[in-house]
Amino acid sequence: MSKGTIHRGRTLGRLRVRRAVTDPEHPRQRSTKGERTRERIIDAAGELFSRSGYRAVSLRDIAAHAGLTHAGVLHHFPNKEATLIHVLSRRDAIDAPLVLDVGPNHGALIDNLVRIVERNTRTPGLVSLYVNLSAEATDPAHPAHDYFFARYRILREHLVPTFAVLLEGRPNPTPEVAAQQFIALQDGLQVQWLLEPGAIDMRAAVVSFLRTLGITTSDPLPPPDERPG
């Protein structure tokens, strides 16, 4: 698959794997011991990748963090890249429908993206994971390069027509620029929030940016004295 080809399935990136057993939309009656072990490995990989990045972590590190032997991890995953694919795909099972399933409801897409920002404030490990991996993945040789390339392409493809409708009649910014600004704002806020979480209100900053464009959300900002932090 070429870099310009984007999956249209239930993922925001290029990676496809079987559905994780923790997908809340499709719960199972029970999980086998092997599935529970796989989830433990994915948890361990996600924690280590978020803390140290992908390249600084070995499969043996993941095994030790999961309380398993190296051979035990290899029984479930052939290599470190396979664990990365599952770590990224697990979250996409939750986030992708919020972006891909809204259809022509442009207001719903904006509301859902604001909800994702809000939810990210409760998952610092995940935010750290994406910040570290997206920076590393600018290298075309990185195993997550195509994933993040496609993720940004898909977000822009959905945001540009949304801003075209919501900004109708405004000469500036163009829908393309507004989409780029929105994504850049989210990414930059995440870095600042990781450095100084108590001083950064990511959701408030995103909603405020949208207001400067004349766009309101279904859940507006509370008065300043009622905001957290």
Identify the residue ranges that each predicted region occupies:
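Hydrophobic alpha-helical bundle segments that form small-molecule/ligand-binding pockets
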Residues: 141, 153-178, 185, 214-229
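Short, basic, alpha-helical segments at the C-terminal edge of helix-turn-helix-like DNA-binding modules
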Residues: 89-95
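Helix-turn-helix
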Residues: 37-40, 44-82, 86
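Hydrophobic alpha-helical connector segments
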Residues: 86, 97-127, 169, 178-182
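Amphipathic C-terminal alpha-helical segment
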Residues: 135, 182-200, 212-222
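Amphipathic alpha-helical segments used for helix-helix packing
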Residues: 122-149
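Amphipathic, non-transmembrane alpha-helical scaffold segments
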Residues: 34, 42, 88, 145-156
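N-terminal intrinsically disordered/low-complexity leader segments
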Residues: 1-36, 219-229
